[in-house]
Amino acid sequence: MNNFPWITSIVMLPILAGLLIPFIPDENGKNVRWYALGIGLLDFLLISYIFGYKYNIQDTSLQLIDDYEWISSINFHWRLGIDGLSIPLILLTGFITTLAMLGAWPIQKNAKLFYFLMLAMYSGQLGVFASQDLLLFFLMWELELIPIYILLIIWGGKKRLYAATKFILYTALGSIFILIAAFGMAFYGENMSFDMQILGEKEYPINLEILFYICFLIAYAVKLPAFPVHTWLPDTHGEAHYSTCMLLAGILLKMGGYALIRINMNMLPNAHIYFAPYLAIIGVINIIYAALTSFAQRNIKRKIAYSSISHMGFVLIGISSFTDIGLSGAMLQMVSHGLIGASLFFLAGTTYDRTRTLILEDMGGIAKYMPKIFAMFTTCSLASLALPGMSGFVAELMVFLGFANSNAYSIEFRGIITFLEAIGIIVTPIYLLSMLRQVFYGSENLKLLKVNNLIDASAREIFIISCLLVPVIGIGIYPRILTQIYDLKTNAIIEHLEIIRSNSQIM
């Protein structure tokens, strides 16, 4: 345990600082914007300091542990810590949240409430990635749901009530299964505990372990999202403000993938061996179905939302591959998509600010009026379709090769999955390039040009996209800069699974 609670500090700073927002004198939201941005940046700098000076990249064990007893009767602890699985996503959370606050600069309606909710989400998402107590993990998982619901209700589009209700129903109902499984695992055996390390060391009857696995899988599949519990995402993205979309695409979806690795894969390995082939099948369905469905979307944000569902399918396939390179690719895909997805939704929002429409047919021919936005949108779309030299290409290639070379499956099964993956990789450029054509090329909408002032990107907007694209290109050129952070941890998980699989009769 640490002398100074480093991880508690980064988790609690945003929400505690947010509680001071009502006392800030402000009329037009200017002071609140700068205050929230300063807190977000301060927390991100603190995260960066911890990673640079306090975290040992060569140590696969849990580090910088904060452990305080909370409710002794059920052995519930405030237990936080970081390792190779959590630190990349904690860095991603700090980075994207800070940029999302800068992206929300034009918001003036209820600015104090808006930025408080952003800071509360910040704490909740950091808490999910840092929690090492399963009940605390559940509380943090729930903490970020309420801010998103309110952000949708107040700052959403015309169908915001429907989208917010659907979001809360899907995610809250899914979360119930986390609570059921958490108490089931904690109460099993002689020593009651929610400590993830202790729970992972328990030996459960295989039928009970499978039951726990299914409960967790339902909740995480909703958050990822995975087919068929994905339908909340396009509706939510379609109605949410684009700064909220940046957090949804950049961080929220990654919570599902992270939890599958941290809990299902790491703590319930026998059940994971049984379910892995089904995860691969669901992953392929995600890739193909969402890519094809994206073609039919007329709303630009819904189209990008379906592309997110498609890209998260690669995470499922990487998790199910039983290979070092496959799991490493899944982690890389989560970080890569977080950056690219946030950039695409931000650009969709800036385009809406100028055209006042999200319908693709109502746009067209605006490239010459907004050349900077056009250039940035094109670059981000190329990154999303996994252009070589971008992070998405490396991530998808690693997942593809990892599953193709897995010795856990028959050659026929591997062949079918990799073939369908390849189809998805081919289809993705078609709908993304089609989106670019509809928005920026073709005949001009004279009514659109007459009503709206199509000014080009501001310095603030260029700065945000540049910040998101620099790591995308950097990781694409030299992926080791990211993979070295978590490779030892993911390799240890795969080695543990291989030992269990070699002694198991499940597969």
Swiss-Prot record:
It catalyses: a plastoquinone + NADH + (n+1) H(+)(in) = a plastoquinol + NAD(+) + n H(+)(out); a plastoquinone + NADPH + (n+1) H(+)(in) = a plastoquinol + NADP(+) + n H(+)(out). Keywords: Chloroplast, Membrane, NAD, NADP, Plastid, Plastoquinone, Quinone, Thylakoid, Translocase, Transmembrane, Transmembrane helix. It is found in: Plastid, Chloroplast thylakoid membrane. GO terms for molecular function: NADH dehydrogenase (ubiquinone) activity; ubiquinone binding. Its EC number is 7.1.1.-. Pfam families: Proton_antipo_M. GO terms for biological process: ATP synthesis coupled electron transport; electron transport coupled proton transport. One of its GO terms (cellular component) is chloroplast thylakoid membrane. InterPro entries: NADH_Q_OxRdtase_chain4, NADH_Q_OxRdtase_chainM/4, NADH_UbQ_OxRdtase, ND/Mrp_TM. The keyword Signal does not apply. It is a multi-pass membrane protein. The chain crosses the membrane at residues 4-24, 34-54, 87-107, 111-131, 134-154, 167-187, 210-230, 241-261, 273-293, 312-332, 333-353, 383-403, 416-436, 462-482. It is an enzyme of class 7 (translocase). Belongs to the complex I subunit 4 family. PANTHER family: NAD(P)H-QUINONE OXIDOREDUCTASE CHAIN 4, CHLOROPLASTIC, NADH-UBIQUINONE OXIDOREDUCTASE CHAIN 4. NCBIfam families: NDH_I_M, PRK02546.1, PRK12561.1. This is NAD(P)H-quinone oxidoreductase chain 4, chloroplastic. It comes from Mesostigma viride.
